[in-house]
């Protein structure tokens, strides 16, 4: 107890000798707001080679190297840096990746494997189609499968926040073989492995939801 009394006495003495008023004042702490730096929107070009390495470059860089870019890359898309790239696979999935998450740089930069920046797994999946999310919003997509099932889907069906969704329902042992943007005045041509062809207007293709199986096309 005597030791405690001595300590308390010393603390009181120090407080009296060295005490000073607080020099700073915290005001409206409950209203403090942290704002993210706004990204300046600009058009870029998405490039992905046959090995799955993806990157974006500015439009002028692409235009200066257009011939080499077209020869070296499997997928080339003009898009906004604030948008998303949609990756459709044979097993009926759609993966999304933000353009901002894709490496941006020089034309000769290698980029990163698309597997590393999205949920796509090149060891288990195969890409059928890649497009820009914003451009797809105003389009209709035609789906065709190995077993001859087809359907049209409104692009707005794929305006989602999830990184991976089911883009179409498939029957057992079936897979997506073709996806493309279609307009009502186009014609569709289906071909069988036996060499039979069937041609019909795109307007006649049944429009369905993304979660539905298509109808028999051929």
PLM features per residue range, with description:
Residues 1-218:
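C-terminal interaction appendages of subunits in large macromolecular complexes
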